[in-house]
Amino acid sequence: MEIVHVPVMVKEVLSYFSNLRGVFLDCTVGAGGHSEAILENIKGSVVIGIDVDEEILSVAKQRLKKYESEGRAKLLKATYVEAQRVLSQLGVKAVNGIIMDLGVSTLQLMKGERGFAFSSDGPLDMRMDKTQRLTAYDIVNFWQENQLRRIFFEYGEEKRYAGRIARFIVKNRPVETTAKLVEVIARALPEKERRFRRRHFATRVFQAIRIAVNNELENLRNFLVQVPDILNQNGRIIVISFHSLEDRIVKEAFRSIQELDVLTRKPVRPSLEEVRENPKARSAKMRIAERK
């Protein structure tokens, strides 16, 4: 598979990691962009990269094979909630840097059969981990209307039309493909909502379903409480998020965990130049904390 994924805010990541050495944990290695930058620019660095998506992990393995052969990179299939177990298995007690990029990879979005994108037709899947049972199809076709309304409201921040969209989905079952789901959402929304929203009108619903399928918010909370146990003193954690729900969780966790010093009162945003070159970076927010 051709590598087209461009990692976001690489310069900022390297800047905040510049004084660190030793072992780094890439919790969402994806296509390997941030890991590659760390290995290339931080002398003597070693990266442990984990990702729950085997397909994209194979891309990272290809990209980082030189470093794997040198013993400077170790890539494993795991979710970041399992980070402590993974490090223990590798004989690593703690690391000096942690990077998390919570965005969906371009490679995942490009493959219609993964079901993440509303821009290309495919089955309703949306699983990061293809071995798990719950899919987007299950949620769309079998969850009760009030359950759908709740996730659209809470996870998609679809404040005004969550109930109406849920009602239309239930009424039009079975909904088997991403294209059919987009069609149903379109019918549920007034024309002005479809035409004048800043982002595509299906964005919020797709986000909500993806978060529910992969238990993303709960996993993030469960990981962040582990950070003091796996980060060395003066080590740093960088989290890049792409919507307000994730950013709020990171902000509150960094503030509430006593062992962390927050280095960013407000989130760091990508430069205008980066956004021009890589529009995916537009909504990125980076927060950094340091282990006391």
Curated annotation (Swiss-Prot):
UniProt keywords (A-Z) are: Cytoplasm, Methyltransferase, rRNA processing, S-adenosyl-L-methionine, Transferase
Which Pfam families does this UniProt record tie to the protein? Methyltransf_5
By its UniProt entry, which HAMAP family does this protein fall under?
16SrRNA_methyltr_H (MF_01007)
Q: Where in the cell is it found?
A: Cytoplasm
A single GO BP term for this record reads: rRNA base methylation
Entry's EC annotation: 2.1.1.199
Asked whether the UniProt record includes Lipid metabolism among its keywords, one would answer: no
Source taxon at top rank: Bacteria
Q: Which InterPro entries match?
A: RsmH, SAM-dep_MeTrfase_MraW_recog, SAM-dependent_MTases_sf
* Family annotation (PANTHER family): 12S RRNA N4-METHYLCYTIDINE METHYLTRANSFERASE, S-ADENOSYL-METHYLTRANSFERASE MRAW
Q: List the catalytic activities from the record.
A: cytidine(1402) in 16S rRNA + S-adenosyl-L-methionine = N(4)-methylcytidine(1402) in 16S rRNA + S-adenosyl-L-homocysteine + H(+)
Q: What does this protein do?
A: Specifically methylates the N4 position of cytidine in position 1402 (C1402) of 16S rRNA.
Please give the Gene3D superfamilies that the UniProt record associates with this protein: Putative methyltransferase TM0872, insert domain (1.10.150.170), Vaccinia Virus protein VP39 (3.40.50.150)
Cleavable signal peptide: none
Q: What's the family?
A: Belongs to the methyltransferase superfamily. RsmH family.
Q: Name one GO molecular function term.
A: rRNA (cytosine-N4-)-methyltransferase activity
Q: Which organism is it from?
A: Pseudothermotoga lettingae (strain ATCC BAA-301 / DSM 14385 / NBRC 107922 / TMO) (Thermotoga lettingae)
GO CC annotation, single: cytoplasm
Binding residues for S-adenosyl-L-methionine, per the UniProt record? 32-34, 51, 87, 101, 108
**Enzyme class per UniProt:** transferase
Q: What is this protein called?
A: Ribosomal RNA small subunit methyltransferase H
